[in-house]
């Protein structure tokens, strides 16, 4: 050790000692190992830094993400997400390599947590100057700066103590959720409150940031307020929804109702590990919080959902598009907006419930009575999308208790199907969000009898494509759902149609913007169709006066949807696509210069038919609905000279939108016809006849 090679210099001893203190999990194990050798550890770190055998794969570039809302950012703490197949040992080695390379450059780092079980990666405290270095490490997929998440109820100082409004004998659900366990990620809770005593287990999990401000006092009743109230809404004895459900609480929000993305991630990882160690029945995770859009938080929710866990979250209280927030924007999460006693959107001062295509449904969220942390028998009213999400978590617990084998897709479809329809005043929402926001208020199903034979479908909107000439938008169904039809919508009316195509082993709906257009939406009709065999048949432009035609030619396959798009554009000289099954219900007919696509499915007992409704004079909106017992699977338009903006499904109704009638004239040539394809299960029809 007395001589130093000119090619390899030793680090100063004080720096090495400091580095050992900050090495994180790997370093801690080395320090605790009585046989560990100080010099060997240093040499190992130097070797890992200098040896660059594990270079990043060619053609792959790690990306950096941070919250779009600057006040919510937490610079200096980063979640490093590694590629999906990365093992724990590789995660730890990557973390050590980052520390070694940072130390050589004179930077100190601290590994706060190594993720394992939910997603591979680690949480590191380091200077932002090291981001470029970290992004070049092997196995790194992307890095996200940590950010804040917040409880989604009004502040505690606006609450008012109220005597209980409900009596136990007034609300008797068919199943209390006794077979379901609900995890609540929130503040601490007052577990000895009479509403939830014996129903909630407080875990030892806690990952919260320090409270803001030096004068903040951690008064127990304020620290427990949000979590106690929500636990009471979910399963309280008097004011709870699922009175039989058991709960486990994890503390991820501090006394001010503030947490972090990283703390929430570690909480979700805790749930996944608990699930693996001790498998139980159906699990519901309630996330009554919101932060800025987070790729890593959405990814963690996706992993947990695909492990069979139902996640329910608050849409957010920012009177904004829910797609801008996480976890509300995660497709695998059931996102809930808030309504009041009149089924209208909740207003909270200058703000209010979030809205938009990422919201699945709404639920009661204003002046909700629940357990108060002020005393063990006190009640309080609180408002917000947290309370709305708690209602849906309770409903989900009861539905899962009645049918424990339900998948997330089946549960979501049932929640939508049994909701109260078209009761919300859409004028409250911004004009550009009205068509995207579901007009649904959650309700308990009257009975699960016969639901297994019901054909459930929902409408999924894509994000807006943007205005560029070749822009496209893509709408996707959940993994357990079948895409039965595809349509498109453009506020300017300039679009090149839509088509169904395979992507990643699943069919997706892709819509095409047109020259001079302002952007387009793709609209997927996603259905539960067990044992289905579905395919898309395409006919290229026929260039014949009779138009382009395509049909379901396979034996036993029925037509569930039609779509059409232009391969090239002729600056608007083409007519809009004509989609009309004529004569037999298994044929799509379109313009001779368009490609026509038919969605054809074979499933036990499936039968379909076509319904049309036309208005001789031009109208801004034309609709046609399927009868009771039938489910809308396809929605398209048969236009004349009117400029059709698009067609889309709202519940069981096909809606065709056109330009303002003042710009289209009033001749019969401007007539528009809405074309619906309605399907049902013969098993359900037979069961209904037997009941009658």
Curated annotation (Swiss-Prot):
Gene Ontology BP annotations: apoptotic process; cellular response to insulin stimulus; cellular response to starvation; cholesterol homeostasis; cholesterol metabolic process; kidney development; lipoprotein metabolic process; liver development
Ranges where the record places region C-terminal domain: 450-692
PANTHER family per record: PEPTIDASE S8, PROPROTEIN CONVERTASE SUBTILISIN_KEXIN TYPE 9
EC number(s) from the headed UniProt entry: 3.4.21.-
Active site: 186, 226, 386
InterPro entries: PCSK9_C1, PCSK9_C2, PCSK9_C3, PCSK9_ProteinaseK-like, Peptidase_S8/S53_dom, Peptidase_S8/S53_dom_sf, Peptidase_S8_subtilisin-like, Peptidase_S8_subtilisin-rel
Job of this protein: Crucial player in the regulation of plasma cholesterol homeostasis. Binds to low-density lipid receptor family members: low density lipoprotein receptor (LDLR), very low density lipoprotein receptor (VLDLR), apolipoprotein E receptor (LRP1/APOER) and apolipoprotein receptor 2 (LRP8/APOER2), and promotes their degradation in intracellular acidic compartments. Acts via a non-proteolytic mechanism to enhance the degradation of the hepatic LDLR through a clathrin LDLRAP1/ARH-mediated pathway.
SUPFAM superfamilies: Protease propeptides/inhibitors, Subtilisin-like
Regulation: Its proteolytic activity is autoinhibited by the non-covalent binding of the propeptide to the catalytic domain. Inhibited by EGTA.
Disulphide bond pairs: 223-255, 323-358, 457-527, 477-526, 486-509, 534-601, 552-600, 562-588, 608-679, 626-678, 635-654
Expressed in which tissues: Expressed in neuro-epithelioma, colon carcinoma, hepatic and pancreatic cell lines, and in Schwann cells.
Glycosylation (residues): 533
Residue numbers marked as site, Cleavage: 152-153, 218-219
Coiled coil stretches, renumbered: none
Subunit-level organization: Monomer. Can self-associate to form dimers and higher multimers which may have increased LDLR degrading activity. The precursor protein but not the mature protein may form multimers. Interacts with APOB, VLDLR, LRP8/APOER2 and BACE1. The full-length immature form (pro-PCSK9) interacts with SCNN1A, SCNN1B and SCNN1G. The pro-PCSK9 form (via C-terminal domain) interacts with LDLR. Interacts (via the C-terminal domain) with ANXA2 (via repeat Annexin 1); the interaction inhibits the degradation of LDLR.
Recorded consequence of changing residue 554 to E: Increases interaction with ANXA2
Every Inhibitor I9 domain range: 77-149
Cofactor(s) the record lists: Ca(2+)
Name of the protein: Proprotein convertase subtilisin/kexin type 9
Family to which this protein belongs: Belongs to the peptidase S8 family.
Span of the signal peptide: 1-30
Protein's gene: PCSK9
Stated consequence of mutating residue 533 to A: 1.5 kDa decrease of the apparent molecular mass of pro-PCSK9 and PCSK9 and no effect on processing and secretion
Keyword Calcium: yes
């Amino acid at each position: 050790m007395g001589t130093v090679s000119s090619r390899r210099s030793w680090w100063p001893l004080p720096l090495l000692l400091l580095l050992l203190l900050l090495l994180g999990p790997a370093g801690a194990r080395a320090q605790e190992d009585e046989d560990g050798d100080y010099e060997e550890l240093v040499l190992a770190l130097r070797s890992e830094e200098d040896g660059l055998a594990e270079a990043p794969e060619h053609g792959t570039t790690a990306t950096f993400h941070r919250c779009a809302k600057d006040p919510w950012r937490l610079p200096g703490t980063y979640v490093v997400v590694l590629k999906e197949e990365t093992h724990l040992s590789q995660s730890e080695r990557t973390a050590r390599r980052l520390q070694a390379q940072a130390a050589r450059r004179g930077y100190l780092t601290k590994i706060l947590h190594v993720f394992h079980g939910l997603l591979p990666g680690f949480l590191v405290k380091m200077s932002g100057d090291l981001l470029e270095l970290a992004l070049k490490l092997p196995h790194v997929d992307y890095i996200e700066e940590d950010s804040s998440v917040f409880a989604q109820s009004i502040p505690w100082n606006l609450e008012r103590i109220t005597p209980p409004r409900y009596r136990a004998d007034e609300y008797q659900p068919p199943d209390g959720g006794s077979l379901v366990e609900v995890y609540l990620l929130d503040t601490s809770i007052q577990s000895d409150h009479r509403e939830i005593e014996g129903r909630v287990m407080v875990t030892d999990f806690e990952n919260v940031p320090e409270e803001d401000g030096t004068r903040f006092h951690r008064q127990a009743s304020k620290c427990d307020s949000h979590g106690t109230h929500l636990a009471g809404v979910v399963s309280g004895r008097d004011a709870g929804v699922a009175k039989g459900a058991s709960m486990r609480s994890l503390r991820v929000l501090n006394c001010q109702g503030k947490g972090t993305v990283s703390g929430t991630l570690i909480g979700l990882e805790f749930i996944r590990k608990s699930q693996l160690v001790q498998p139980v029945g159906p699990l519901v995770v309630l996330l009554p919080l919101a932060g800025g859009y987070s790729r890593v938080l959405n990814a963690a929710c996706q992993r947990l959902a695909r492990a069979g866990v139902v996640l329910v979250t608050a849409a957010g209280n920012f009177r904004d598009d829910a797609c801008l927030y996480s976890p509300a924007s995660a497709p695998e999460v059931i996102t809930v907006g808030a309504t009041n006693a009149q089924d209208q959107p909740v207003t909270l001062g200058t703000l209010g419930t979030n809205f938009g295509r990422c919201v699945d449904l709404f639920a009661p969220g204003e002046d909700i009575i629940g357990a108060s942390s002020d005393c063990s028998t006190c009640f309080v009213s609180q408002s917000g999308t947290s309370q709305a999400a708690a209602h849906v978590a309770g409903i989900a617990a009861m539905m899962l208790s009645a049918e424990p084998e339900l998948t997330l897709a089946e549960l979501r479809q049932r929640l939508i199907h049994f909701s109260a329809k078209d009761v919300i005043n859409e004028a409250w929402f911004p004009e550009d969000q009205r068509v995207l926001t579901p007009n649904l208020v959650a309700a308990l199903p009257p009975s699960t009898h016969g639901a297994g034979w019901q054909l459930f479908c929902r409408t999924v909107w894509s994000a807006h494509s943007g205005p560029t000439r070749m822009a496209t938008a893509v709408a996707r169904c959940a993994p357990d759902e079948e895409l039965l039809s595809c349509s498109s919508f453009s506020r300017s009316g300039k679009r090149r149609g839509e088509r169904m195509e395979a992507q990643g082993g699943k069919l997706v709906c892709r819509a095409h913007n047109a020259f001079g257009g302002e952007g387009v939406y793709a609209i997927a009709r996603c259905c539960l169709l067990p044992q289905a065999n579905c395919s898309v048949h395409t006919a290229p432009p026929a260039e014949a006066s009779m138009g382009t035609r395509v049909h379901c030619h396979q034996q036993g396959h029925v037509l569930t949807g039609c779509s059409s798009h232009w391969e090239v554009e002729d600056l608007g000289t083409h007519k809009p696509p004509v989609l009309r099954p004529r004569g037999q219900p298994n044929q799509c007919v379109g313009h001779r210069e368009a490609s026509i696509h038919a969605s054809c499915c074979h499933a036990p007992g499936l039968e379909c038919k076509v319904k049309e409704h036309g208005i001789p004079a031009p109208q801004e909106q034309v609709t046609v609905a399927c009868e009771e017992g039938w489910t809308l699977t396809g929605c398209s338009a048969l236009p004349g000279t009117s400029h059709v903006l698009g067609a889309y499904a709202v519940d069981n109704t096909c809606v065709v939108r056109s330009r303002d009638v003042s710009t289209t004239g009033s001749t019969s040539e401007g007539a528009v016809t809405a074309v619906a394809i309605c399907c049902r299960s013969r098993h359900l029809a037979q069961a209904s006849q037997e009941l009658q």
